[in-house]
């Protein structure tokens, strides 16, 4: 019984290691995708957004 428990534990560790090595299965299309522009206004647009919005969210009424 003890050998069976040890065998199951070793198998679980090996399967876990295999999943970590394989990663999350990124497809080539995902890796080569063009990053989305979160700031289409450039630096000026980002600065104006900060001035317009409230930088301290919990304290804004």
Swiss-Prot record:
Tissue specificity as recorded in UniProt: Expressed by the venom duct.
Residue ranges of the propeptide: 24-52
Disulfide bonds: 54-60
Molecular-function annotations in GO: ion channel inhibitor activity; toxin activity
UniProt keyword annotation of Disulfide bond present: yes
Oxidoreductase keyword on record: no
GO CC annotations, alphabetized: extracellular region
PTM annotation (D-tryptophan): residues: 59
Cellular compartments annotated: Secreted
Main location: secreted
Residues the record lists as Cysteine amide modifications: 60
Keywords, in A-Z order: Amidation, D-amino acid, Disulfide bond, Hydroxylation, Ion channel impairing toxin, Neurotoxin, Secreted, Signal, Toxin
Alphabetized InterPro entries for the sequence: Conotoxin
4-hydroxyproline modified-residue sites: 58
A Pfam family annotated for this UniProt entry: Conotoxin
Comment text on domains: The cysteine framework is C-C.
Protein name listed in UniProt: Contryphan-Li2
Organism expressing this protein natively: Conus lividus
